[in-house]
């Protein structure tokens, strides 16, 4: 245990691993683009740089706290540093912010506004790279990458896949799959974690919004939506509601107003999956099938086992995922002439 003076205020610490954690616990907002407590410390963006009483500057995310330290987090020097860092990042960044899928939710854009970066004094020196649309789950745009390394670390450290890594050095450095392959031709399991950790639009979720709107506009198409359990407690935060609050009723109301004819809860098919997997387990147990039985609820997990542990492929359940099972159930139900009203369109949320 020790005490650090931060901006003139004494703050006690115990077992915090770095200065950044202590500073944030003290209620001081330090900007970062590459730091995540779940990942290893990388120290790439340098936005969390602080100054000590001797005028020395260092990244707080990688600095071990010491008793008696005197730290300043918002001096004039630090403000200039941070503004310059944002400018340099933008100098090597694609600037089509108005049409970017991450516009309004981009950490780099937010920090540029915060530090008053209204223009960039430097020309973009990077050669434009092709956008990778090969994956069914994500879109990778290397022109918007700021080399924070978040996607590389989450793919390696948390997911254990290693589909992305750094290549080349200096001004030529970039993040890419091995041998610059398309992401779909790598060991990527389509988990989407890289997109969650990406602070810009370099990795975004692949969507089919246009197809959904076309289906909703077609009077001859019966459009069905199914909502995953996680969505009901996650979507509310985007509209200012308390995090974790269930908004299933609001979701159903909104989807009906948009034009969806039917809205189903994927939790129902999750129960179906449990029933089917239980039956499969009993069958394997009685008849000497491959054990242990591994769930097939998550397509990313199934692909991960197939790619990383091929010897265990036969251990994975043959059941569909809850979303796949719900889709099959609704398709079979409305295929019946008594229930059918023309074409069927389905949207998974």
Which stretches of residues belong to each language-model region?
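Residue-level recognition of alpha-helix initiation/capping sites
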Residues: 14, 136, 146, 189, ...
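Short structural boundary motif marking the start of a folded domain
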Residues: 1-4, 347
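A short N-terminal beta-strand-loop micro-motif at the entrance of redox/enzyme domains
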Residues: 9-15
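Short strand-turn-strand beta-turns centered on an Asx-Gly dipeptide
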Residues: 6-9, 52-54
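Iron-sulfur-associated redox domains of electron-transfer enzymes in respiratory
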Residues: 15-68, 74, 78, 206-348
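Structural motif corresponding to the C-terminal cap of alpha-helices
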Residues: 159, 198, 334-338
